[in-house]
Amino acid sequence: MTDILNKILATKAQEVAAQKAAVNAEHIRALAAEAAPVRSFIDSIRGKHRLNLPAVIAEIKKASPSKGLIRPDFRPAEIARAYENAGAACLSVLTDEPYFQGSPEYLKQAREAVLLPVLRKDFIIDEYQVYQARAWGADAVLLIAAALEQGQLERFEALAHELGMTVLLELHDETELEKCRNLTTPLRGVNNRNLRTFEVSLDQTLSLLPALEGKTVVTESGITGKADVEFMRARGVHTFLIGETFMRADDIGAEVGKLF
């Protein structure tokens, strides 16, 4: 299969260059400084854990490269409210347009509709995008180890923390652990979907658990219902990033409620 991640990153580099030309770095930094106060993403997750509940990072996603259009009837504010009312800890909103049909407007609409903290879900390759995330109102950013070098990971994490945001560090396998050794974020996501082939296996999370002892592990992709949640919780994983299962449901709130 074509290396999907490299294709996405090449497109992203062109996209960021165009965005910088439209809104220069100085302006985006000023917008970030003026953004609404940050809501604590990590505290919201820990609040669920203190209640002995699974912490669900509920994703707002219209489409994906592997599945195409997932939710034709796509209204971010309504989806966000359904998630909040059903007990989600946080939101994740796709802002990548070419591959996921996302938009910064979706992030803004979702955040304005609820009190939950919101993650910008995108492929961050430049510190400009970290400022951009805060300018749009994001409370957290995703950093993908497979997409970045060690120095980039460390710089982008430091900048996100300087701006008050939580970092969700996404890992996929043992080879990525070494370049993340200096990162301080407690939130470590394990993507059960291989970003190079898009195949899914929950074993990805289980294989990395011993190396992530003491961290708040987020299992991402492939969680389809309560059985998967209970399976992971029995093994010490209590935080779940779930998108497609919810996005395909007629009643999103009811689908989230099935996990509790």
Curated annotation (Swiss-Prot):
Reaction(s) the record says it catalyses = 1-(2-carboxyphenylamino)-1-deoxy-D-ribulose 5-phosphate + H(+) = (1S,2R)-1-C-(indol-3-yl)glycerol 3-phosphate + CO2 + H2O
Say which domain of life the source belongs to: Bacteria
Name the keywords, alphabetized: Amino-acid biosynthesis, Aromatic amino acid biosynthesis, Decarboxylase, Lyase, Tryptophan biosynthesis
> InterPro entries, from UniProt?
Aldolase_TIM (IPR013785), Indole-3-glycerol_P_synth (IPR045186), Indole-3-glycerol_P_synth_dom (IPR013798), Indole-3-GlycerolPSynthase_CS (IPR001468), RibuloseP-bd_barrel (IPR011060)
SUPFAM superfamilies in UniProt: Ribulose-phoshate binding barrel
Q: Name the Gene3D superfamilies for this protein.
A: Aldolase class I
Give the EC number. 4.1.1.48
Record-level Gene Ontology MF annotations: indole-3-glycerol-phosphate synthase activity; phosphoribosylanthranilate isomerase activity
In the record, biological process GO terms are: L-tryptophan biosynthetic process
Q: What class of enzyme is it?
A: lyase
Pathway(s) served:
Amino-acid biosynthesis; L-tryptophan biosynthesis; L-tryptophan from chorismate: step 4/5
Q: Which NCBIfam families match?
A: PRK00278.1-6, PRK00278.2-4
Q: Which family does it belong to?
A: Belongs to the TrpC family.
Q: What is the protein's name according to its record?
A: Indole-3-glycerol phosphate synthase
